[in-house]
């Protein structure tokens, strides 16, 4: 797929208690899937179909065989197995590293496209939210570094206005470490009108 093209979108929300919801818009209608167990998603197929994939692959030993293509269904199956296979830890940096390893394993490789699958698109960035330490990690395919925002350093009061971290054209600005001081005043994001 190409940046700027219409595509299926799922939005994942989670909180510090481990609660989770997946929001998806199908034919302009919002559907919310709410369950603590919903820890993985891809933009396609519909989330109910992703749950069916989980049921199918849940019967297969993922240490012996997992699907390996760039198709969303295969990436979802890998991520679903791996998120439950990584070690659970109270060390937040180790936990973030483990989650990044799952996301990288399930990312669509750079430049891969399939003619009859226009929504198969390169993974351009990955994010991990650390609810415990209130850190938001970001990794761009263009950057050699993972960087993060310490949300405790951000003033979310309405009076401070909108701020953004300018990643530059195609996310080519390079950041390293904690970047809350690099945020600049900006205009609010404007959504394109629905067709």
Task: Give the label of every model feature segment.
Residues 1-37:
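Structured, non-membrane catalytic/scaffold regions adjacent to prosthetic-group chemistry
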Residues 4-7, 16-18, 39-195:
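C-terminus-biased signal that marks the final domain/tail of proteins
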């Amino acid at each position: 797929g190409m940046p700027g093209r219409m595509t299926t979108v799922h939005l994942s929300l989670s909180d510090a208690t481990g609660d989770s919801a997946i929001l998806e818009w199908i034919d302009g209608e919002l559907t919310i899937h709410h369950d603590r167990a919903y820890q993985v998603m891809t933009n396609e197929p519909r989330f109910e179909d992703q749950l069916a994939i989980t049921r199918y692959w849940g019967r297969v030993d993922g240490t012996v065989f997992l699907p390996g293509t760039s198709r969303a269904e295969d990436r979802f199956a890998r991520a679903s197995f791996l998120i439950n296979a990584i070690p659970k830890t109270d060390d937040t940096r180790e936990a973030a590293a483990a989650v990044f390893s799952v996301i990288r394993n399930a990312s669509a490789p750079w430049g891969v496209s399939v003619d009859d699958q226009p929504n198969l698109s390169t993974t351009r960035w990955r994010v991990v939210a650390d609810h415990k330490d209130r850190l938001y990690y970001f990794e761009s395919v263009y950057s050699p570094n993972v960087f993060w925002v310490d949300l405790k350093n951000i003033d979310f009061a309405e009076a401070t206005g909108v701020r953004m971290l300018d990643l530059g054209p195609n996310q080519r600005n390079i950041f390293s470490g904690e970047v809350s001081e690099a945020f600049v005043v900006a205009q609010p994001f404007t959504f394109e009108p629905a067709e």
